[in-house]
Amino acid sequence: MSGGAGPDGGRILTTSPGEIAEQKAILRGHMREIRAEAAARDPDAAIRLAARFPARLFERYGPVVAGTVAIRDELDAAPLLARLEGLGARIVLPRIETDGAMTFRDPAGAPLEKGPLGLAQPSGEAEIVRPNLVLAPLLAFDLRGRRLGYGKGYYDQAIARLRATGRVFYLGLAYAQQQVDAVPIAPHDLLLDWVETPRGSIPLFLGRAVGR
């Protein structure tokens, strides 16, 4: 049995897969409210994040960057993607395939389709491209690099496949308010290398990506 502090200061006990799933569900509900409040209070957050994003990360881990199209109150990656494209990045976007796997495809200016969870994604005819740098939305993160998503495992599975064939830098985009003491984690959950917020950069075990 192991544990850590939750967002309310309580203990997070990780004793079984069922309990971990329950803890994640509770935390998701709480963090949806936190993120919605942060987004409402700071409508210019995405612009500030893009302006202060460290170009050295792209220079080291580019040139192919997997972005995302924001849904609901996610931190909008569009201003950052525009800046990176200006620096020479090739931008690809995630697509959820019919088998549930996430691939990354070059939209090449074509209209996006509606995918699972309301995600705007490239068509199945778009070229699949392997990214070097993956930007991921999230609900919560901690300083160990743990990420709380929506529970489908799309990013964990995609990053695992990418890391099996070479280096990839896994970067979360978040409001600073989305940081918690400890995110419940299951064996298949992968750790972030970095989190970028409108307030600053948070390196997380950078050496994991450097070694790949």
Regions found by a protein language model. Give the residues of each.
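Surface-exposed, charge/polar-rich loops and edge strands
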Residues: 2-22, 26, 33-40, 125-134, ...
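Short linear sequence motifs
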Residues: 97, 147-148
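Glycine-rich, N-terminal phosphate-binding loop of Rossmann-like dinucleotide-binding domains
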Residues: 69, 138, 199
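Short glycine-rich anion-binding loops that position phosphate/pyrophosphate groups of nucleotides
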Residues: 71-73, 139-143
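N-terminal active-site beta-alpha-beta segment that forms phosphate/nucleotide-binding
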Residues: 2-130
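A structured binding-face within diverse protein domains that lines the active/interaction site
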Residues: 121, 137-140
